[in-house]
Design a protein with these regions (language model features):
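Short, low-complexity disordered leader/linker segments with a strong preference
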Residues: 1-33, 58, 62, 334
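Extracytoplasmic "Venus flytrap"
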Residues: 33-59, 70-79, 175-179, 228-232
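An alpha-beta-alpha
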Residues: 34, 52, 143-190, 293-309
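Short beta-strand elements in bilobed, periplasmic/extracellular small-molecule ligand-binding domains
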Residues: 60-81, 141-142, 187-205
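Beta-alpha junction/loop-to-helix N-cap segments that form part of ligand/metal-binding clefts
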Residues: 70, 74-133, 227-249
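Hydrophobic alpha-helical segments within soluble ligand-binding/sensing domains
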Residues: 125-167, 266-287
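Pocket-lining segment of extracytoplasmic ligand-binding domains
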Residues: 177-246, 250-252
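Hinge/cleft segment of the Venus flytrap/periplasmic-binding protein
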Residues: 281-334
Length: 334
């Protein structure tokens, strides 16, 4: 009897072990779930998202195969971004990809007491946003890529196009840390290029058109930041500037396509791809987000729109036809 009981116990133990082993294997081999929180609808952020998925795919993590994507766009509403991050935490996703600074900060706050890593992209100043330390290291289980503007290169380009200009206007959102720090950078170096920076702060997308109508009376041109609220309302800025006959300079290629005259900007698809490769390392257990410094693309590229320049009677340097990384002969409004 004792032998039969012992044999039964061994059998049950082995079965339990096998079941446990199967469960572990399923856990190890199951696909990943990533919650993507994108703050607003505009081309550069869309390109980041597409690049992010492409970067993951190049590392063997492909949507529809071993990756499930839960995508939410906050429509430039901070409260929606915060709710989205909390929902992702409740769903226990494997990772949150946060696109743009407001989404990144809300995701970081929501995951602070969890083990869910956050990978961000299109954050202009991770240090100012509280997502990284001064040396570039992470403040927690979060890392990503930075889209800091090449301010000096942008101002030099504006000077080349507008040799007699003195005042450059910037409209920015007062609640976006990335915009505040970039404005400060413009103000710090503007005199080196013979410019004065004129700023107007807004708190909501509905204020952008009014700010633009007032701004065009005071400046020779407007230069955009990667400000999510203002970029989402870009057509309002362009409408007022075109009526006044002054150029608007973009901060990336999608703004130039949409009607800005030119930009020394980043390629956001490539930025997103770089982010996707960082995310793959974390998902595969090859690195921890907390141990990874944020990364950036250091070299800007020249983008020009000859149709946008012609619309306001502005002649661009002839060399731009060959020097530009990409040029456009039509305006493709978003």
């Amino acid at each position: 009897m004792k032998k039969r009981i012992l044999a039964a116990m061994v059998t049950v133990t082995m079965a339990a072990s096998l079941l446990a082993g199967c469960g572990k294997a399923n856990t190890e081999n199951k696909g990943y779930t990533i919650g993507i929180s994108q703050f607003a609808v505009h081309g550069s952020l869309d390109n980041c998202r597409e690049g992010f998925l492409a970067g993951l795919a190049e590392e063997g993590i492909k949507e529809g195969e071993n990756l499930t994507v839960d995508y939410v766009n906050a429509q430039a509403e901070p409260a929606t971004a915060s709710m989205t991050a909390s929902n992702f935490v409740s769903k226990k996703v494997d990772m949150i990809c946060a696109i743009a600074t407001p989404s990144a900060t809300t995701a970081y706050n929501a995951t602070m007491n969890t083990d869910i890593p956050v990978i961000y992209t299109a954050v202009s100043d991770p240090v100012a946003a509280g997502l990284a330390k001064e040396d570039g290291s992470s403040v927690g289980n979060i890392t990503g890529t930075c889209d800091a503007l090449a301010v000096g290169a942008q101002l030099k380009m504006i000077r080349d196009i507008l040799p007699d200009a003195t005042k450059v206007g910037i409209i920015y959102t007062t609640s976006e840390a990335n915009s505040i720090s970039t404005v400060a950078e413009y103000e710090a170096v503007a005199a080196d290029y013979g410019f004065e920076i004129v700023t107007t702060g807004v708190t909501a997308m509905s204020e952008v058109a009014i700010a633009a109508a007032d701004m065009v009376k005071k400046v020779d041109c407007i230069t955009n930041l990667t400000d999510n609220t203002v970029v989402t309302a870009l057509q309002s800025v362009l409408e007022e500037a075109n009526k006044a006959g002054i150029p608007v300079f973009g901060s990336e290629v999608e703004q130039v396509k949409a009607g800005c005259v030119a930009s020394m900007g980043l390629e956001y698809f490539e930025l997103g791809k770089q982010t996707g490769k960082m995310a793959a390392k974390v998902l595969k257990g090859e690195a921890k987000a907390s141990d990874m410094q944020f990364e950036t693309i250091t070299e800007p590229s020249l983008y020009v729109n000859f149709a946008a320049a012609e619309k306001i009677g502005l002649k661009l340097p002839e060399s731009y036809k060959t020097d530009a990384y990409e040029s456009f002969d039509e305006i493709i409004a978003e």
